[in-house]
Structure formats: C-alpha cells, structure tokens
Amino acid sequence: MTQIADRPARPDETLAVAVSDITQSLTMVQAINRALYDAMAADERVLVFGEDVAVEGGVFRVTEGLADTFGADRCFDTPLAESAIIGIAVGLALRGFVPVPEIQFDGFSYPAFDQVVSHLAKYRTRTRGEVDMPVTVRIPSFGGIGAAEHHSDSTESYWVHTAGLKVVVPSTPGDAYWLLRHAIACPDPVMYLEPKRRYHGRGMVDTSRPEPPIGHAMVRRSGTDVTVVTYGNLVSTALSSADTAEQQHDWSLEVIDLRSLAPLDFDTIAASIQRTGRCVVMHEGPRSLGYGAGLAARIQEEMFYQLEAPVLRACGFDTPYPPARLEKLWLPGPDRLLDCVERVLRQP
C-alpha cells in the first residue's frame, strides 16, 4: 500500500476543481466514474476498492479504468466479504486515507451491518469529533432492472436510522457526480445509494460548477395542488405522473427530489406544503416503518395546521422484494401515486 502520512482528511482537498473541467452529456455510470476519477486525481489519499472493482471495473463498469490509471495500490479488488470491506475502510480512514468502498449490490450489504453500525457510524462520536471518518460507501441500490434475489432492495431506512451516517440518493447524472464529490470530501461517513435503474439515463454534467451539497433538496417541478416528495428512481416516475395529472385531470403537482435523506432538507418540504396544503411521499421500500413513515409523521407533527389532508404514502408492499417477474407489480408506479393524489384532493 502507498505510504501516506497519517492525518485527518481535509474536505477542501478532496473537492478540488475537477480534472476534466467541462460540461458534457453523461450517463449516470459515466458521471460516477468521472467523480471517482476527479476525486482520486485531486487527492492521493482517495482509495477505491470492493468486489471486482479493479480488474473488471465493477459489475456495472462504474469503476472501469481507475485501476489502470491510478494503479493497484489505489484501486483494488477485495474478497467477497462485505463486513471485511467496511472494516478495511474504517481502518484505512483511521490511518489518514479517504476510502470509497463499494458494496456490489444493496442486498449484499447486510453482512456489513456490524461494522457499519458499531464502528463506521460511531467513530466520530466515540472520539468526541477528534477522529474523522471520511468513508463513502457506494451501493448500487433499489429495483427496476429485473434482477435476481439479493440484487434489488431498499436499504435506506436502515442507514437513516443509524445515527452518525449521512445518506444520499442521486436521481440525475449531475447529482450523481456532485453528491459523490461532496460525499468524498465529507469528514463523516456517507452511504451513497446509486439507483441502478437510472444508471444509463443521460444528462448534462458541469464538473466545474458544484451543485447543492448534502442536506439540500431540489424542487424538480413547481405546482400548486399537491407536494410529491421522493428520491432516486422515483423522481422520473413522479415527474411523468405530474405531466399526466396536469393533462388528464388539471392537477398541479410539485415534485421535490430529496437527494439527501439524512440530513433532511425539511425547510424545502415545509415551504412547498405551505403553498399546496397536501403531500404524498413516494418511495420503493415497504410501507411499514419505511422512509416515508417517519417523514409523514414529522410533516404531520410540525405542519398539522397547514395541511388540508393527511399525508399519504405511495410505496412498496410489506413483503420481501419479489422475483423479477413480479417486480413491476410490486414497485410503486404512476397509478399508485395518482391514486394517492386523488385521495388527498378529495379532502374538503
């Protein structure tokens, strides 16, 4: 391993100006790859590792070319042992490195829970902030690609419930690039959940102009009747549903892309609900105690007198993630969302 003096990570170093300082059309896979490349070029302490990330470039080719460019000391393969991957990351961070480990699929993350919950999330608090833990855990996540068991899941609620972690979910290539750059520059551990279904969606990425950092939501579509709060894969679903709602029913939906699940930008949500008076939360995971449950509870606790109707949730079912042939029936889609919209609009 390359010998680098022990010292805590400095965010300003890992968020240096991009090496490829241009605006261009990229897929999400390309945007994440570019973010990793630029972060590694900006700071020699940034290390990328995981199952098949070096020789194969990852199962989705997200890390392709990094080992060739930066060498086997900085981009390397690991055994098929997720707990070990996170344990290695914690140890490297303690020695002054900036690790970016990959868990190959969200359904493979469960063996790593002990290392994540007991050590990764707690080290900064355990040391009263004296030790940084600049670890960004990349996890291809969520459904929509017809994958086998363990290859599609919604793990975000586990991570959000683990105090000490930041949790982000990009929905566009631009967000994928900049949220990853911000995550790598952060002294706290960040769970970076990549929506697999959006991997090949294309968009403009400006690597010279930072987009909003972790903790900031974005209003993707303005509206006046109902606030739809969502993230990841379902942002595009919400936007297309909003078009349908306007064309067929003359309903005006405002769509908020959370981007950051923890910390949460509640101010943006509250400002929207002040205008609309109604809210639907949409996410892929099961309904019971899913991410939307806590968010809906907070909205109703803090904005009860601004609401014209109860907050509803359009989400997955309380079953294990289904086999590929049933996935489309299980995942929330336009029909489930618009049913919730109609129900909140029925309220007087």
Swiss-Prot record:
Keyword presence, Glycosyltransferase: no
One term under GO cellular component: plasma membrane
Pfam families: Transket_pyr, Transketolase_C
Listed cofactors: thiamine diphosphate
Active site, UniProt feature: H151 (proton acceptor)
Reactions accelerated catalytically: N(6)-[(R)-lipoyl]-L-lysyl-[protein] + 3-methyl-2-oxobutanoate + H(+) = N(6)-[(R)-S(8)-2-methylpropanoyldihydrolipoyl]-L-lysyl-[protein] + CO2
Domain of life according to the entry: Bacteria
UniProtKB keywords: Oxidoreductase, Thiamine pyrophosphate
Positions bound to substrate: F105, D106, G107, F108, H151
InterPro entries found in the cross-reference section: THDP-binding, Transketo_C/PFOR_II, Transketolase-like_Pyr-bd, Transketolase_C
GO biological process, one term: branched-chain amino acid catabolic process
Gene3D superfamilies referenced in this protein's UniProt entry, alphabetically: 3.40.50.920, 3.40.50.970
GO MF entries: 3-methyl-2-oxobutanoate dehydrogenase (2-methylpropanoyl-transferring) activity; magnesium ion binding
Induction (free text): Up-regulated upon nutrient starvation. Is also highly up-regulated in a DlaT-deficient strain. Part of the bkdABC operon.
Subunit field text: Heteromer of E1 alpha (BkdA) and beta (BkdB) subunits. Part of the BCKADH complex, consisting of multiple copies of BkdA/BkdB (E1), BkdC (E2) and Lpd (E3).
Protein task: Component of the branched-chain alpha-ketoacid dehydrogenase (BCKADH) complex, that catalyzes the overall conversion of branched-chain alpha-ketoacids to acyl-CoA and CO(2).
Annotated protein name in UniProt: 3-methyl-2-oxobutanoate dehydrogenase subunit beta
Protein encoded by which gene: bkdB
